[in-house]
C-alpha cells in the first residue's frame, strides 16, 4: 500500500476507494507488482497535475459553487438581500426611482439589473423606474473633464434623484472613489443606499449605507457572478410581489 499512500487516495473516485485498495493489494501480491503500481501512481499524479482545459473549467466551477454555498448558509447575506428587495418594493410603491452605478464589470451589472426592472423579468407588467448612471458617455466625460472622475455618479444624482429614491452601488472592492462619492451624496439627500461588494473591510460604508451585501470572496469574477445572481433574485422578487397576483 506504500505507493497508494504516497499518491493519496484522491487519485480514485470517491465511491471507488475500497475497490482501489483491493486492486492494489492484488497487484502487490504479484511478482513485480509494487513497481507496476508505483509506475501507475506516477502516471496518475502527472495527469492530475496537468493544466488541462477541462480541469481548469472544473476548478472555476468549484470556486463558484463554494461561494454560493457560503452565501446560502450566511443569514446576514440572505437576510440583507431580502431587506433590499423589500425596500425597493416600498420605494416603487411610492413612485420612487432606483439608480445604480459601478465601474467596468460592475457598470455592466448596473445596466443589466436596471434593465430587468425597466423591461421585464418574467411577467408582463408595467415598467419600473430604474436607471444605471453609467450609460451616457457625454455626461460621464463632461463631468469627468469639468469636475473629476470621482463625481461622475454623484453629479447625476444631484440632477435626477430625490429624497425617497434608492441607489445601488456596485464595487467588488468597495473602495471605488466615484461609487463612494455617490453614496455620500445620496446619504445626505435622504436617498436610501445599498452597496454590493466582495469580502473586504471598508469602515466608512457603515456610515453611508443602509445595506451592505458582501459576497464571501475576494476573487473579482466570482464576486461579479454573485452580484448578478443577487440582482436577478431581487428583480424577480420585486416583480412577483408588486405584480405577481395582480396580472
Residue ranges and their predicted role:
Residues 10, 27, 167, 193, ...:
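Short, well-ordered beta-strand core segments
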Residues 86-161:
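Glycine-rich, small/polar surface segments that engage phosphate groups of diverse ligands
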Residues 196-214:
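Glycine-rich, charge-decorated loop segments at or immediately adjacent to ligand/cofactor-binding or catalytic sites
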Residues 1-52:
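Mg2+-dependent phosphoryl-transfer enzymes with acidic/Ser/Thr/Gly-rich catalytic loops
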Residues 95-96, 164, 190-191:
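Glycine-centered short loops/turns at secondary-structure junctions
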Residues 52-76:
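Generic N-terminal amphipathic, Lys/Arg-enriched alpha-helix
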Residues 1-7, 174, 178-181:
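Acidic, divalent-metal-coordinating active-site segment for phosphoryl/phosphodiester hydrolysis
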Residues 40-51, 159, 221-247:
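A charged, well-structured terminal subsegment
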Amino acid at each position: 500500500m506504500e505507493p497508494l499512500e504516497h499518491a493519496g487516495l484522491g487519485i480514485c473516485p470517491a465511491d471507488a476507494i475500497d475497490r482501489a485498495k483491493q486492486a492494489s493489494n492484488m497487484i502487490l501480491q504479484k511478482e513485480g507488482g509494487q513497481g507496476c503500481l508505483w509506475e501507475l501512481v506516477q502516471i496518475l499524479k502527472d495527469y492530475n497535475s496537468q493544466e488541462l482545459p477541462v480541469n481548469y473549467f472544473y476548478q472555476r466551477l468549484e470556486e463558484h459553487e463554494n461561494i454560493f454555498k457560503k452565501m446560502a448558509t450566511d443569514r446576514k447575506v440572505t437576510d440583507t438581500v431580502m431587506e433590499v428587495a423589500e425596500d425597493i418594493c416600498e420605494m416603487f410603491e411610492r413612485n420612487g426611482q432606483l439608480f445604480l452605478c459601478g465601474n467596468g464589470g460592475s457598470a455592466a451589472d448596473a445596466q443589466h439589473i436596471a434593465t430587468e426592472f425597466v423591461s421585464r423579468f418574467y411577467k408582463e407588467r408595467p415598467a419600473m423606474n430604474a436607471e444605471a448612471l453609467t450609460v451616457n458617455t457625454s455626461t460621464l466625460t463632461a463631468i469627468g473633464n469639468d469636475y473629476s472622475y470621482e463625481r461622475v455618479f454623484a453629479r447625476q444624482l444631484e440632477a435626477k434623484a430625490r429624497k425617497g429614491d434608492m441607489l445601488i452601488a456596485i464595487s467588488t472592492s468597495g473602495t471605488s472613489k466615484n461609487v463612494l462619492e455617490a453614496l455620500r451624496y445620496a446619504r445626505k439627500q435622504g436617498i436610501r443606499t445599498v452597496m454590493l461588494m466582495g469580502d473586504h473591510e471598508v469602515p466608512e460604508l457603515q456610515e453611508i449605507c443602509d445595506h451592505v451585501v458582501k459576497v464571501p470572496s475576494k476573487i473579482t469574477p466570482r464576486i461579479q457572478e454573485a452580484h448578478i445572481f443577487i440582482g436577478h433574485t431581487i428583480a424577480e422578487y420585486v416583480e412577483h410581489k408588486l405584480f405577481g397576483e395582480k396580472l
